[in-house]
């Protein structure tokens, strides 16, 4: 039971509004989950972290407002078009900026916090040192500690493909593999 484990927040993905969710929820499902979670003193945050095209942004803005009216405690976003609309409606205090790749330093994080947001999520694709630097200088940040979600959600066999294309010899199931970019000193777990 998650409550016994100390879980105090549930993050849900809104249908058609994220690119990294394993399951997406409808408005009616979100409403039911909010009621259940609030009964157990847990907060509910909805993920709307995709970037929207010109033809989709206005519908997404309206949907964001509808989701917030379902009683959720917050909403995670990536598209500045959602922030613009939220500011017009005085809803920015419910928002958490959650870019998957667009924030790379504490100045980025501080900029988003200065927009009146609830929080920012430090991207899990950064190195541990980069994450720690951003968290050190930016108050009220969220750090994802369970690993790189984007690669795992994609279900692509990236290590196997790399091994085959580059004719390398290593165990793709090894727990000790890491990646190193040319311009960074730190290693990232694979």
Regions found by a protein language model. Name each.
Residues 109:
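Conserved N-terminal glycine/acidic-rich loop preference
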């Amino acid at each position: 039971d998650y409550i016994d484990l100390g879980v105090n927040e549930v993050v849900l993905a809104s249908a058609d509004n994220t690119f990294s969710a394993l399951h997406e929820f409808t408005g009616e499902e979100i409403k039911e989950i909010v009621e259940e979670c609030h009964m157990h003193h847990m907060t509910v945050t909805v993920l709307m972290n995709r970037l929207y095209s010109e033809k989709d942004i206005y519908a997404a803005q309206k949907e964001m407002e509808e989701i917030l009216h379902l009683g959720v405690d917050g909403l995670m976003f990536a598209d500045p078009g959602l922030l613009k609309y939220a500011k017009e409606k005085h809803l920015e205090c419910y928002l958490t900026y959650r870019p998957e790749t667009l924030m790379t330093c504490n100045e980025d994080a501080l900029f988003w916090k200065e927009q009146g947001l609830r929080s920012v999520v430090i991207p899990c694709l950064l190195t541990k040192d980069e994450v720690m630097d951003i968290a050190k200088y930016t108050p009220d940040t969220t750090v994802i500690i369970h690993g790189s979600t984007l690669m795992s959600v994609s279900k692509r066999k990236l290590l196997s493909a790399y091994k085959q294309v580059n004719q390398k010899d290593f165990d793709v199931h090894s727990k000790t593999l890491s990646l190193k970019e040319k311009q960074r000193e730190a290693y990232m777990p694979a």
